[in-house]
Curated annotation (Swiss-Prot):
PANTHER family: UPF0145 PROTEIN SCO3412, UPF0145 PROTEIN YBJQ
One protein family per Pfam: YbjQ_1
Family annotation (HAMAP family): UPF0145
SUPFAM superfamilies assigned to the protein according to its UniProt record, in alphabetical order: YbjQ-like (SSF117782)
Protein name per the record: UPF0145 protein LVIS_1527
Transmembrane regions: none
Family: Belongs to the UPF0145 family.
Length: 107
């Protein structure tokens, strides 16, 4: 994970003045293989955490933030403020995660 560009969920960066460049996104869609899906279906019957899907979502969030950073850097940004996540299912075995925020340039 590349962390050289600040990404924060806050609106302000203490001690920094900046101008807004624009909105920025990082997206990914992940899926599990058929065998893992069968294991998840069995776990769904008995209840409890489906660790493979938890791991997949964690990886998807990390990938989406990495892509957000790259896209912000490509826009000439120094940081991203007001970062948020959105996620949703595609079919029964895919998950899409978006990291989005406002790209800013220090003045």
């Amino acid at each position: 994970m590349n962390t050289d560009l600040l990404v924060t969920t806050t609106e302000h960066i203490p001690g920094k003045e900046y101008e807004v460049i624009g909105e920025v996104f990082g997206l990914t869609t992940q899926s599990k293989n058929v065998l893992r899906n069968m294991g998840a279906a069995l776990k769904n019957v008995v209840g409890g955490e489906i660790k493979d899907y938890t791991k997949m979502l964690d990886e998807a969030r990390n990938i989406s933030v990495d892509r957000l950073r790259k896209n912000a850097r490509d826009m000439g940004a120094d940081a991203v403020v007001m970062m948020r996540f959105d996620s949703g299912s595609i079919g029964t075995d895919m998950q899409s995660v978006a990291a989005y925020g406002t790209a800013v340039k220090y003045v």
